[in-house]
């Protein structure tokens, strides 16, 4: 009943109005899985390749008809007749057929869409929710937890058209007892922040991930206005709400220096920028910092881990790109203590699960993440619960492409009840 009988690829539109790949996988029992590939803006240089057409006369070169053709042609032919429940085999067939290190033949966007659609179809054929099927694929059947959200309420960097260098300023509702309560707390702070920004004459337009994107005098000012909003919403900073940042430092790394254009082109060495971040953690309850240095600055990361790693969660995104080879090197060298997990950085569900397992086995945490270009596909919610990853980044409290994931988490928590605990701050490395 789980044999693949049809695969359909199509070009759809993501949350930025750019094309992306959607795949349908049909099984002989009439079961269907539907999944879409997300797309990043600030991308690591070692990510699996997102195949774009490059035809400037169509979607400004961002079309994905080549990737869709790969789904409808060679990929479909290769997986027809195969058992969708054997996820590792489905993924291996596609990866081997592509034959490149970075999936550049078919595109990670093509392979990932089929990989996730096959998993959804297989879950349906087993009569299981997707999170339960993922837990079985993960070798941890029935072991679930609800993730602590990192809510990106001020957007900067590549995610917004403003003067803020650091890409994401996030809140974590650690005082919540349930995921649903965490979402309520996040929503209240988000709306209160709008009032705070308006009272200061600042804009409340939102960025790619649904957070506000005001022009600010400094990166520290973003933390200050969030702190004000937390208090005005009736919460205590550090007890009810903690803070997290994604520096995406590769985006402002120039000629061996970290240059903050929004602060008058202030320039820092790796060590200086580490201490700049350390000073912020002394002023505010920041418990997690992502990509605090450039992805290639491993010597700097070793220093940053030495200085901050025993008290702050240091998350590698561009640094590790959900790649087990790179992650293993980082673990061996004591670089960072957490990995950001993005399906499309590596391009298949099987490889994603391997990265989560490797991180956990090494004592690193794993933070499941969206991309800045998203769709209504909420698979990452099921991934977070099904692997008991413990943390999720899926944007702010606006934009349907972000809220779709929160709503799926609410549904899952309702279905699982006490069998999926919400552990709050305990999930964060160093806390």
From Swiss-Prot:
This protein's UniProt keywords: Cytoplasm, Glycolysis, Lyase, Magnesium, Metal-binding, Secreted
GO MF annotation terms: magnesium ion binding; phosphopyruvate hydratase activity
Record: residues binding Mg(2+): 246, 290, 317
Catalytic EC class: lyase
Binding site for (2R)-2-phosphoglycerate: 167, 342, 371-372, 393
Record text on cofactor binding: Binds a second Mg(2+) ion via substrate during catalysis.
Pfam families, sorted: Enolase_C (PF00113), Enolase_N (PF03952)
InterPro entries from the UniProt entry: Enolase, Enolase-like_C_sf, Enolase-like_N, Enolase_C, Enolase_CS, Enolase_N
GO CC annotation: cell surface; extracellular region; phosphopyruvate hydratase complex
Summary of the function given for this chain in its UniProt record: Catalyzes the reversible conversion of 2-phosphoglycerate (2-PG) into phosphoenolpyruvate (PEP). It is essential for the degradation of carbohydrates via glycolysis.
Protein name: Enolase
